[in-house]
């Protein structure tokens, strides 16, 4: 049996207006582009790094 991949749910809580282009691109990479959007992503070090980069714009809802 294969192990189920861990996932993490992230919600965008603040706008990307007047933010650096790299932060906007990071939000798009996280499948977020509007306030209130929720994305379920694989829990990898890369994803964690992207969340850390825009931690002031998003919140982690659930880790499974």
Swiss-Prot record:
Q: Give GO terms for biological process.
A: translation
* Native organism: Nitrobacter hamburgensis (strain DSM 10229 / NCIMB 13809 / X14)
What are the record's GO terms for cellular component? cytosolic large ribosomal subunit
Q: What is the lineage of its organism?
A: Bacteria, Pseudomonadati, Pseudomonadota, Alphaproteobacteria, Hyphomicrobiales
Q: Hydrolase: is it a keyword of this entry?
A: no
Gene, per the UniProt record: rpmD
Q: What is this protein called?
A: Large ribosomal subunit protein uL30
**HAMAP family, alphabetized:** Ribosomal_uL30_B
Recorded GO MF terms: structural constituent of ribosome
Protein family membership: Belongs to the universal ribosomal protein uL30 family.
